[in-house]
């Protein structure tokens, strides 16, 4: 038979020769060792800091396991000889076990013969192979006394066997104050080796196992690996708490029952992620009928099986994918090539035909997803206890799988629509490829109707994979330039002499409140000379209107309309309405008495009357005036200046003889109009802000339909202020309001004036008293 061979093996970053089985166990049970050492192998836990006594059976299971391969068994036999005479019987027993595997142990034939043992040791020292070096270390450790063993064991680090050296030190309890610094050096070597490949192992090495505080029974059950026994105990515990809450219909009880219901769905989702679908059925059967009627209302009880089969199918596709980043899960638990149950056979295809059953399936899939995303337990619980370190990645994978399952249900028969395809944007390219391959294999052998459904799913995935779907909130660089012109582009427009009211004089960003004064430059006409409009920008343009061109007469006559405001009437409620209001639980119509207060019907009527009483008559007048049609004005190029008739001959208007009825303030707008005495970018002054301010960049007072004007009375302002009284305002100021039609004096406003459409310096037209210095306006 062949002699045993020695060499360094690696298990997920852990290099070892003597403790190969231990290295494999640790790499596969990191979470268990870190969070629940009492449930782990006691010898492995003691290596990482557990103070619990070591069970000899646990140690032997790691040294000479019954199912080990020949190399691992031979390495464990070396350990039995190095750990002391008490393990010699186990070494002898393993010789026969190794022989059955077709191997012999080279030390077993010389262990009882000192001469042969020494001769083998000397012969080994002459060899330079890695295998010989490992055997040399074995002879040195075996031959040294206890006080010298630490140094002999430390030499294993030169062979890249730092893990074996650390385990020997722990197993033989060689660590003390004198060699503490040397032990820390060995740990540093391990940290450096594991830092990139296995960070959780580094955490376990540095922090040690958690000597768990006592936890409640329920949390203890949730931390155990999933079995039928632990699942049954957990379900029964939740049922007991749920049943105690059933008699109470208060809000607090409803919240508790909602949380407990999510705990049921968490256990169901855990079975699907664990690839133990049949245990999901156990969850439903263990729940008694009164509780089940609430947890699975309506059709959800009937379609629970279909929801479980669909969720399990898609989750397992994601779990077993070769692109799965959770390597430990992919390698140890799942396979992407497993067969799945036919959807028609399990009734899922029939449920797809009914929209109400599809709706119930969708609700259950949403509950599955919520149960793993939200914190449904008092203490943190991983979806798969053995893989707590990968819990976040695992939850993301499961929720994506459930989201795709929900897509299949919600977009049944509309899978290839544009909206349906856009909903698949949450899947990455590799996931779509995997799903296409899986469903392509799955549809083989199905009937025609099932094949049509699966082909629509595949077609939608292929279209989503090939076409670039862009989010509504994403724009290309060119689109951004088109939708949001920069300040530099606005400046360029000004420099080229653009005269539109939106662009003229605008050389600052659109969000800036900086005002640029423009002295008596009308934005509606062309500039004949260059103008400095601020910020070092000059506007230069050619006047396209010749001086000899005459203006056509303006013959439009505005017609006055009068509309009587309608008085609002309050219709008293009927007796039926009063009784319904009295019987209602709350004013908002919801069955939530703890969150609403009943408001008596009489109080509601009184409140409405008070609000109507506070409204001035002018408001009602304004409402009726808003319906007055405005005569169509002739184009500007046909207008001609005409002399307005004397005040006595002026026709009455809808406002009466000089009636200066105030109007409601209009909503301020962002009108970037720049003109001599007209609108400006931001109305500022002494009065109420109007829709457009007066000249000199600001007008204040005289906001639209009311307010006392400031230095440049606003358009249509009441009691227009100085230097440009408001249009349609009473008491116009030094210059009448805008829309004056080029009146005389300082700019007499139209319909403005002193008291009754007059004007201090340019009587407005249609006004009562004329201004002090004439210059009457149009009409």
Curated annotation (Swiss-Prot):
The keyword RNA-binding applies. The dimerization domain also acts as a hinge; changes in its structure probably impact oligomerization and RNA-binding. The RNA-binding RGG-box is required for the recruitment of some P-granule components such as pos-1 and probably mRNA, but is dispensable for granule formation. Guanyl-specific endoribonuclease which cleaves the phosphodiester bond in single-stranded RNA between the 3'-guanylic residue and the 5'-OH residue of adjacent nucleotide, resulting in the formation of a corresponding 2',3'-cyclic phosphate intermediate. Essential role in male and female postembryonic germline development; maternally provided protein maintains a population of proliferating germ cells and zygotic expression is required for correct oogenesis. Together with the P-granule component pgl-3, is involved in the formation of P-granules. Homodimer. Interacts with pgl-2 and pgl-3; this association is not required for P-granule localization of either pgl-2 or pgl-3. Interacts with ife-1. Interacts with prmt-1; the interaction is direct. Interacts with nmad-1. Interacts with P granule components meg-1, meg-3 and meg-4. It catalyses: [RNA] containing guanosine + H2O = an [RNA fragment]-3'-guanosine-3'-phosphate + a 5'-hydroxy-ribonucleotide-3'-[RNA fragment]. Its EC number is 4.6.1.24. Keywords: Developmental protein, Differentiation, Endonuclease, Hydrolase, Lyase, Nuclease, Oogenesis, Repeat, RNA-binding. GO terms for molecular function: identical protein binding; lyase activity; ribonuclease T1 activity; RNA binding; RNA endonuclease activity. Residues 563-596, 611-661, 718-779 are annotated as: Disordered. It comes from the Eukaryota. Residues 612-626 have a biased composition (Basic and acidic residues). Does not require metal ions for catalytic activity. Residues 584-595 have a biased composition (Polar residues). It is found in: Cytoplasmic granule. Residues 699-772 are annotated as: RNA-binding RGG-box. It comes from Caenorhabditis remanei (Caenorhabditis vulgaris). GO terms for biological process: oogenesis. The active site is at 453 (proton acceptor). Residues 203-464 are annotated as: Involved in dimerization. This is Guanyl-specific ribonuclease pgl-1.
